Amino acid sequence: MHSFTSFALVAASLASVAQAHFQLQWPGARGAFVANDEVYFCGAHNNVTTNRTDFPLDGSGFVSIKSGHAPYTVGAIISLETDADAWEDFKNSSGGDQIAIAYRQVDNSGTYCVPFNPSSLNIAGIQDGANATIQVVYTGGDGNLYQCADVTFRTTVANLNSSVCTNSTGGDDHSHSSSVTGSTTASAPSTSQTANAAIPFDRWCCYHPWLCWYLRVSPVKTLKGLLLSLPYPCNAFQ
């Protein structure tokens, strides 16, 4: 019974971690959504899609995500490379991330939408007909998650309904409208480290002190070995 209780506690903790994910709603994401792959560059979709989304330069564009976790920090970086398939493609001339959308903290789960006007970035090459990749960077407190959207900039985009850029709260975000806002004072997560690096046990304890204490005093020492062997995305805090 003692072993079963210990296992149940670990399972519950890992289940809570699994809920920290998001899905890119618009523009269309590069490749199919796989929750476990979000810890990798572009959600493990390195190849640029041939089916790019037309993205307006007239200020009517937006980026919309759906989060299953709160609170979280989210922002976006951008590359104007035709085949953006590496972190270096999202760097500016100084070697820093080329920011498209400033990082902000959001306190509610559900749909979150940010108006985005690429023309306001003053980045050379942003013009009608140019290809680009927008990479959304998200962290729910346990590491970075990523999804990419390959776009082609257009002066205007017909039939784009910007009124769908709304926010909602809660797990069922189909009926709960809200004036959710994000603070743009959040610090930018690091995007330069290995996304699936194993987290040291002592750092894991920082996130789950109650469970860590239990494992230290529990006779079921094999659970600690199990946890140490798990690849755990914690690069945002290294």
UniProtKB/Swiss-Prot annotation:
Binding residue positions for Cu(2+): H21, H69, D142
Lipid attachment, kind GPI-anchor amidated asparagine: N196
Residues carrying a glycan: N47, N51, N92, N131, N161, N167
List of residues that carry Methylhistidine: H21
Cell compartments where the protein resides: Secreted; Cell membrane
Biased composition (Low complexity): 177-191
Entry keywords, A to Z: Cell membrane, Copper, Disulfide bond, Glycoprotein, GPI-anchor, Lipoprotein, Membrane, Methylation, Secreted, Signal
Topology versus the membrane: Lipid-anchor; GPI-anchor
Cofactor note: Binds 1 copper ion per subunit.
Region described as Disordered: spans on this chain: 168-191
Cellular component per GO, a single term: extracellular region
SS bond partners: C42-C148, C113-C165
Signal peptide from the UniProt entry: 1-20
A Pfam short name: BIM1-like_dom
UniProt propeptide residues: 197-238
Keyword hit for Heme: no
Requisite cofactors: Cu(2+)
Family under the similarity heading: Belongs to the X325 family.
Function text: Lytic polysaccharide monooxygenase-like protein that has diverged to biological functions other than polysaccharide degradation since it does not perform oxidative cleavage of polysaccharides. Acts as a cell surface-bound protein that functions in the copper-accumulation pathway. May also act as the major cell wall sensor that regulates MAP kinase-dependent hyphal anastomosis, the fusion of hyphal cells.
Protein's recorded name: Lytic polysaccharide monooxygenase-like protein X325
Annotated organism of origin: Waitea arvalis
Lineage of the species this protein comes from: Eukaryota, Fungi, Dikarya, Basidiomycota, Agaricomycotina
